[in-house]
Amino acid sequence: THIPTASAADMAWANAYLFCAPTRFGGMASQMRAFIDTLGGVWAQGGLANKAVSAMTSAQNAHGGQESTLLTFYYTAMHWGSIIVAPGFTDPALFKTGGNPYGYSHTQGAAFTDEVKASIGHQTKRLIEMADKLTA
């Protein structure tokens, strides 16, 4: 089966980006950083600027660096000139899944509950709504 993967060309046409990457030693996995490194040409042409961006992560254990992963990714988005759309504390669903204002984070072995789905859904909906406002 074919699993679609994002490309630099996809980043050029998309109005919003939702990055989901595992945490490794307090940062994004090297495979995601390698993809980000391919975006230099699109970035140099301004193709990543003024786009809505949000991020989610996972780690093997609680306190495994999830928040630092999200924050350091947002530094990259700031270099791009993207507009960060974190979930903040804008929905009660977030408090039922850890209350991370930077983006949803999942711990390995934790159940994929309705609360988790609601938290991810809220962050995704917020990103899409903000992207729509930016492109209106």
Model-derived features with residue positions:
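Glycine-rich phosphate/pyrophosphate-binding loop and the adjoining helix
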Residues: H2, A86-A136
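Helix-loop-strand module that forms the ligand-binding subsite of alpha/beta enzymes
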Residues: I3-D91, F95
